[in-house]
């Protein structure tokens, strides 16, 4: 009831305290339900951090294998950058569980959101993963995906530049109506025929 009218930017500490209360005096499952509810009830800026907290508590209370559902829900609900970060973390978890193919698929998914020139972290993680666990074919596939993502990012940048160049430039100077303006307000009108 305390959280029904609580603004989302202030809800995070209340959810965490409520979950810890359930952990200490209640049931672990109820605490996890509180943390799940917190992922929807906090401000958008805190959602990724809340998902990470929920995943850590799930691993602690019921085991690492149960974190899969939380990761999958987080990836589907967060924006591109959050999904990229959570997918890369999920790949590490899958690798700990011995699921090499699932980890590779998650890294491939996360890499779709990261331009190799501006955000190389995921690409370095995938590169290191393929060096340790991959084959020549899987490494070549990683390089192919990397070129594809780079090309898509370049195309998107080019389209944005073209769109910006099409927009009219607004002048900071006021526009003067030349039809009513005179060069010299003291000018005397002289008829040329009289000369």
Segments from the language model and where they lie:
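Alpha-helical solenoid scaffolds in eukaryotic macromolecular assemblies
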Residues: 1-195
């Amino acid at each position: 009831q305390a959280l029904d009218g609580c603004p989302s930017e202030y809800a995070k500490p209340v959810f965490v305290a409520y979950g810890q209360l359930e952990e200490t005096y209640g049931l672990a499952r109820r605490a996890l339900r509180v943390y799940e509810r917190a992922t929807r009830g906090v401000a958008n800026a805190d959602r990724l951090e809340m998902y990470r907290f929920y995943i850590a508590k799930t691993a602690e209370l019921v085991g690492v294998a149960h974190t899969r559902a939380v990761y999958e829900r987080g990836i589907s609900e967060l924006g591109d950058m959050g999904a990229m970060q959570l997918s890369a973390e999920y790949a590490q978890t899958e690798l700990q569980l011995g699921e090499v193919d699932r980890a590779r698929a998650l890294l491939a998914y996360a890499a779709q959101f990261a331009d190799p020139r501006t955000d190389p972290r995921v690409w370095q993680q995938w590169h290191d993963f393929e060096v340790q666990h991959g084959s020549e074919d899987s490494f070549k596939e990683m390089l192919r995906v990397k070129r594809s993502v780079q090309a898509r990012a370049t195309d998107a940048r080019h389209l944005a530049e073209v769109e910006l160049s099409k927009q009219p430039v607004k002048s900071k100077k006021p526009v003067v109506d030349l039809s009513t303006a005179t060069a010299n307000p003291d000018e005397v009108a002289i008829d040329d025929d009289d000369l």
